Swiss-Prot record:
Residue ranges annotated for the NAC-A/B domain, each copy included: 10-77
GO molecular function, one term: RNA binding
Source organism of the structure: Methanococcus maripaludis (strain DSM 14266 / JCM 13030 / NBRC 101832 / S2 / LL)
The UniProt record lists the keyword RNA-binding: yes
Subunit structure: Homodimer. Interacts with the ribosome. Binds ribosomal RNA.
Keywords: Protein transport, RNA-binding, Transport
Family: Belongs to the NAC-alpha family.
Keyword check for Zinc: no
Listed name of the protein: Nascent polypeptide-associated complex protein
GO biological process: protein transport
Transmembrane regions: none
Length: 126
């Protein structure tokens, strides 16, 4: 690939960089600590990678060099958490007055619908 029997020297590197700039290409090394690529079923994790970004006429290409470690992808677990909403006296009074029920009934309805005023009024209105 390289002239000179495949041997590579720093002077050639400078010439290549100059040629790249002449063609509108620019390369920059990034100081990355870790790179993670998320696939459908696993993760590829590169620890201490060499990352280079090449800009070719406004299009950026990232090159990652290093040893990839395959990591199983854990399913995201979403737990149902029961949230208890604190019902205010103001809300209880509003529902009680709107529906013509006792404050205890209004409070119970508000607790059942997690403090949703409209839902509590509809529930008591039926």
């Amino acid at each position: 690939m390289f002239p000179g029997g495949g041997k590579f020297n720093p002077r050639m590197m400078k010439q290549m960089q100059k040629m790249m700039k002449d063609f509108g290409m620019d390369a920059e090394d990034l100081k990355a600590v870790k790179v993670t690529i998320e696939l459908e079923d696993k993760l590829l994790v590169f620890e201490k990678p060499k990352v280079q970004v090449m800009d070719m006429l406004g299009n950026k290409t990232y090159s990652i060099t290093g040893k990839a470690k395959k990591v199983a992808k854990e399913e995201e677990k979403i737990e149902d958490v029961e949230v208890k909403v604190e019902v205010t006296e103001e809300d209880i009074d509003m529902v009680s007055n709107q529906c013509g029920v006792s404050k205890e009934e209004a409070k119970k309805a508000l607790e059942e619908v997690n403090g949703d005023l409209a839902e509590a009024i509809l529930k008591l209105g039926n």
